[in-house]
Amino acid sequence: MGARWNGWTAGALALALAWPLSSRAQIAETSIQPVPEANWSATAGRTVGAGSSMLQAEAGWPGISFTYLKGLDERSDVGFHIGLNYGFEGTTNRVTGINLAIPYRRNLVSGDTDIAFQMQPGISIYDNDGVLFGIGGPVGVVAGFHLSPPLTLDVGVDIPVLLSFSNPAGFMFGPQFGGGAEYLIDRNLAVTARVRVGPQFGFTSAGSSSQTGFVTLIGLAYNAR
């Protein structure tokens, strides 16, 4: 009888010790959530998604900007952009101005590598010892490489174009090359960074010129889907 009682006691004790261990293992197993798939992007090759709306704020050079994008379908989005600049069109010239544009992006290739065409036509107004008014915007292509579900690296080329009607009147353009990155914090929030650099050419009523233009921006994007 004593041996049987000791056996029951040992079994009950083993069960009591094993239960919290299995419970903790189950809790640990169920509490680890998989990283969400990066099925949208703010500045790389993917769009924001059909019916989704994205808000993005960026700061750096040549200024501070706010962008709204709406997914028209799985491959294209369009929106509105406002830039408050303290640098002239990505050059080292310190001129204050504002840029209002309508960004458009079209995904051309999708998969582990995404390629998109993008443009941002609009108007620019600068205080350049008088009012400089112009129309134009960057046109370019970007390719995004998905290294992991939350991380995307990209390379791209943009050609900023500005047709100025006053102070001075003329035409400015130049190819800019560079790269960037996006990191998805959760399924709706991403941190972005991008850099572009290249020659900038100007043919205006004040004469012709060339200099180095660059863009360096860090941002935060939220997809309200």
Roles of regions detected by a PLM:
Residues 2-11:
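Bacterial N-terminal signal peptides that target proteins for export
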Residues 41, 108-115, 119-225:
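Outer-membrane beta-barrel transmembrane domain signature
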Residues 29-32, 87-131:
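Ligand-binding grooves and catalytic loops that recognize ribose/phosphate and carbohydrate rings
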Residues 10-20:
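Bacterial N-terminal signal peptides
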Residues 63-65, 98-99, 137-138, 176:
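Short, surface-exposed coil-to-beta transition loops
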Residues 21-87, 124, 221-225:
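Short glycine/proline- and aromatic-enriched beta-strand/turn motifs that initiate or cap beta-hairpins
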Residues 5, 25, 195-197:
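Positively charged, low-complexity intrinsically disordered regions
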